[in-house]
Amino acid sequence: MPTIQQLIRTERKTLKTKTKSPALRGCPERRGVCTRVYTSTPKKPNSALRKVARVRLTSGFEVTAYIGGIGHNLQEHSVVLLRGGRVKDLPGVRYHIVRGTLDTAGVKDRRQSRSKYGAKSPKE
């Protein structure tokens, strides 16, 4: 523990918090272009083919992003919007693609939690 004299000489340094989504550069969302769209397998207890995309962002970063929902229309050179949020069972995936914006279509025939998947209100 420092003495009072040491604290007078040099004040305490405040610890900087590390961001969980550095590629966004403090923005809520970022635009990017898909460089590769593929499937990936999750970590140990789970088993599936998760849909992911490699995206080159306007901030210069190239990141891996998860495509949520059932079915998608993304391919190479698709322009997408990215938000933060990791996928727990996919190592290295720290971003989500926002459905229903830019080139990404919303999920078809979605009735519940529509706003999360960019689905329009079903016509009666």
Curated annotation (Swiss-Prot):
Recorded GO MF terms: rRNA binding; structural constituent of ribosome; tRNA binding
Gene symbol of the encoding locus: rpsL
Gene3D superfamilies recorded: Nucleic acid-binding proteins
Membrane-spanning segments: none
Complex and partners: Part of the 30S ribosomal subunit. Contacts proteins S8 and S17. May interact with IF1 in the 30S initiation complex.
GO cellular component: small ribosomal subunit
HAMAP family: Ribosomal_uS12_B
Protein name: Small ribosomal subunit protein uS12
Record organism: Prochlorococcus marinus (strain NATL1A)
Protein keywords: Methylation, Ribonucleoprotein, Ribosomal protein, RNA-binding, rRNA-binding, tRNA-binding
Family the entry assigns: Belongs to the universal ribosomal protein uS12 family.
Function: With S4 and S5 plays an important role in translational accuracy.
GO biological process: translation
InterPro entries: NA-bd_OB-fold, Ribosomal_uS12, Ribosomal_uS12_bac
Region entry Disordered, spans: 103-124
Record PTM 3-methylthioaspartic acid, positions in chain: 89
